[in-house]
Curated annotation (Swiss-Prot):
Keywords of the record: Cell membrane, Membrane, Transmembrane, Transmembrane helix
Compartments in which it is found: Cell membrane
Gene Ontology CC: plasma membrane
Main location as per UniProt: membrane
Pfam family, one: DUF1328
Family, as annotated: Belongs to the UPF0391 family.
NCBIfam families membership: PRK13682.1-1, PRK13682.1-4
Membrane topology recorded in Swiss-Prot or TrEMBL: Multi-pass membrane protein
Name of this chain's protein: UPF0391 membrane protein Bcep1808_5731
Sequence intervals crossing the membrane: 5-25, 30-50
Keyword Transmembrane: yes
Length: 53
């Protein structure tokens, strides 16, 4: 479960780089949305991993 949390975190960081780096207007908006979605998923899976221990 912690592995999924790390994967979602890496995806969130990649989405942040594209979203906040000014690549393209349309892609940046999509990346910002994906960034927040993946951060929430990361936190949920991180909490589930900690609780299951």
């Amino acid at each position: 479960m912690l592995r999924y949390a790390i994967i979602f975190f890496v995806i969130a960081i990649i989405a942040a780089v594209f979203g906040f780096g000014g690549i393209a207007a349309g892609a940046a908006e999509i990346a910002k949305i994906l960034f927040y979605i993946f951060v929430v998923i990361f936190l949920v899976t991180l909490l589930l991993g900690v609780v299951r221990r």
